[in-house]
Amino acid sequence: MKFSSVTAITLATVATVATAKKGEHDFTTTLTLSSDGSLTTTTSTHTTHKYGKFNKTSKSKTPNHTGTHKYGKFNKTSKSKTPNHTGTHKYGKFNKTSKSKTPNHTGTHKYGKFNKTSKSKTPNHTGTHKYGKFNKTSKSKTPNHTGTHKYGKFNKTKHDTTTYGPGEKARKNNAAPGPSNFNSIKLFGVTAGSAAVAGALLLL
């Protein structure tokens, strides 16, 4: 009895293992190594798990004929690295060509730190610096054709005046009236004689 039950249990166990082994080998897996080094796994059976943990065939393993990973961490080919036919990097850190560095045909840097040519330094054809610190020519220094300085501290032009000493003044006051004084009395129609007659009549 015991022998037969042990035998039955053993046979059942062997049958279960055999069924499991048969179920394991009920599918076919093909590994294909392509010329570019990519490995393709193909599973052909209805008993495989299509989506999930053991799905070994995915679209991410299809051969990439460009030789580069198109999207992702190792994408080494981008639009920013297309050849630039101008010979310079157009946009970015090393852009050494800018509009501010176009050749200036005047020979001077037009705008910026080293602009040494300004409108205030245009040639002055009068021979003097017109406006600024060293302007030595002013309207007050225009030539005066009278020969004297017309306005200012050193006006040496005096009116026609004669200076007399004390003796000369007394002599001039006691002198007889000159022709100029006589002419001034004539202007009023009065002579010396008529003046004396008029004075005598007033005393009577």
Curated annotation (Swiss-Prot):
GO cellular component, one term: side of membrane
Residues listed as glycosylation sites in the UniProt record: 55, 64, 75, 84, 95, 104, 115, 124, 135, 144, 155
Lipidation (GPI-anchor amidated asparagine): 174
Upregulation: Up-regulated in response to osmotic stress.
Subcellular location: Secreted, Cell wall; Membrane
Annotated Low complexity bias: 35-46
Keywords of the record: Cell wall, Glycoprotein, GPI-anchor, Lipoprotein, Membrane, Repeat, Secreted, Signal, Stress response
GO biological process, one term: cellular response to water deprivation
Membrane topology designation: Lipid-anchor; GPI-anchor
Principal location class: secreted
Residues covered by region (Disordered): 35-179
Residue ranges with Basic residues bias: 47-59, 67-79, 87-99, 107-119, 127-139, 147-156
Record-stated family: Belongs to the PGA14 family.
Further details from the record: Present with 1380 molecules/cell in log phase SD medium.
Role summary: Hydrophilin which is essential to overcome the simple stress of the desiccation-rehydration process.
Protein name: Hydrophilin YNL190W
Organism: Saccharomyces cerevisiae (strain ATCC 204508 / S288c)
